């Protein structure tokens, strides 16, 4: 299955890395590597994530996985998996939609 990454995700990860690097460059690199490794896991096992509909009060076909302090939101298509957003796990996910 192919992997697509929303351009917003790439930009957000860049900002996330810069923010974390202000305190700890090594941790910033490690965090971003872990997130990209999670993307690869999702690509290989697209149904590994939980259904987001179980955490929110509206219908959605998004799935999510936790990666440290972050939540990766994605959708599974017929030929691809698309990463839509990576958010802080303490952020109110419902405000994204």
Residue map of PLM features:
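Low-complexity, compositionally biased segments
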Residues: 15, 26-27, 54, 64, ...
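Enriched for short, Lys/Arg-rich terminal
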Residues: 67-97
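Basic/aromatic recognition patch in beta-strand/loop cores that engages polyanionic ligands
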Residues: 49-79
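Aromatic side chains
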Residues: 19, 36-39, 45, 62-64, ...
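Glycine-rich, flexible loop/turn motifs
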Residues: 48, 61, 89-93
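Basic, Lys/Arg-enriched alpha-helical interface segments
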Residues: 2-55
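A general secondary-structure boundary signal
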Residues: 12, 29-36, 60, 65-67, ...
């Amino acid at each position: 299955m192919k992997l697509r990454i929303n351009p917003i995700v790439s930009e957000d990860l860049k900002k996330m890395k810069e923010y974390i690097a202000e305190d700890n460059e090594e941790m910033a690199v490690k965090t971003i590597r872990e997130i990209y490794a999670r993307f690869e896991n999702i690509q290989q096992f697209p149904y590994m994530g939980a259904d987001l509909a179980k955490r929110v009060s509206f219908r959605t076909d998004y799935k999510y996985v936790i990666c440290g302090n972050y939540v990766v939101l994605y959708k599974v298509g017929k030929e691809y998996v698309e990463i839509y957003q990576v958010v802080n796990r303490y952020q109110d996910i419902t405000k994204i939609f």
